[in-house]
Amino acid sequence: MRDIQMVLERWGAWAANNHEDVTWSSIAAGFKGLITSKVKSRPQCCDDDAMIICGCMARLKKNNSDLHDLLVDYYVVGMTFMSLAGKHCCSDGYIGKRLQKAEGIIEGMLMALDIRLEMDIVVNNSN
């Protein structure tokens, strides 16, 4: 079973480094210059894996844009729980629960697609 947080961390690093290639004009325009070098220096996934996850993210945006934006803020932009809590006027605990829900939805989509990712070798849990 894959560690969805590791998957999304690698996808987030890929998206941060390739934001001009990602066709999220509303996001890219709003966050231009806000992506820190800390986020950019993380390990990335390959383009093929990123496109699969981008497809899942597009579906999430269509059905629940709040959860999509939360994942982008956390994994691409690199916002902390506290900064997300301030942005959404709620507690950091609530942000954690919302992130878990969003991560679970993406994980479920990847399971339903039954596609092997190249990064599975690195991100699989050995439980």
From Swiss-Prot:
GO terms assigned for molecular function: DNA binding
Keyword Transcription: yes
InterPro entries, per database record: Phage_933W_GpQ
This protein's UniProt keywords: DNA-binding, Transcription, Transcription antitermination, Transcription regulation
GO biological process terms, semicolon-separated: single-species biofilm formation; transcription antitermination
Pfam families, alphabetized: Phage_antitermQ (PF06530)
Superkingdom: Bacteria
Additional record remark: Encoded by the cryptic lambdoid prophage DLP12.
Assigned protein family: Belongs to the phage antitermination Q type 1 family.
Function: Positively regulate expression of some phage genes. Bacterial host RNA polymerase modified by antitermination proteins transcribes through termination sites that otherwise prevent expression of the regulated genes.
Record-given protein name: Prophage antitermination protein Q homolog QuuD
Gene: quuD
